[in-house]
Amino acid sequence: WNACTKQSDCEEDECCLDNLFFKRPYCEKRYGAEQRCSAAAVYKEDKDLYYFTCPCVPMYECLGKGSLDENGNTVMKNPKCIMPTL
């Protein structure tokens, strides 16, 4: 893996990720079009790093069918990287 300190250290289909398990951030592949994804990607603008997981490739969003759990929280079912429609 390639160590990084900011997004521009990585390829376009990667993100600079600090997943808290490794001592240093590294370049990780972003989720591709129609791939299952995690909506847990958190971007910290001041550090120019993502935490937990990478987002989808540019122009795609991690979206799924929203449903409510027993506590009234919205949960995404089967999220995938899709291009949002206008």
Swiss-Prot record:
GO terms for molecular function: toxin activity. It is found in: Secreted. The keyword Secreted applies. Keywords: Secreted, Toxin. Expressed by the venom gland. Gene3D superfamilies: Lipase, subunit A. The keyword Secreted applies. Belongs to the neurotoxin 20 family. This is Toxin CSTX-20. It comes from Cupiennius salei (American wandering spider).
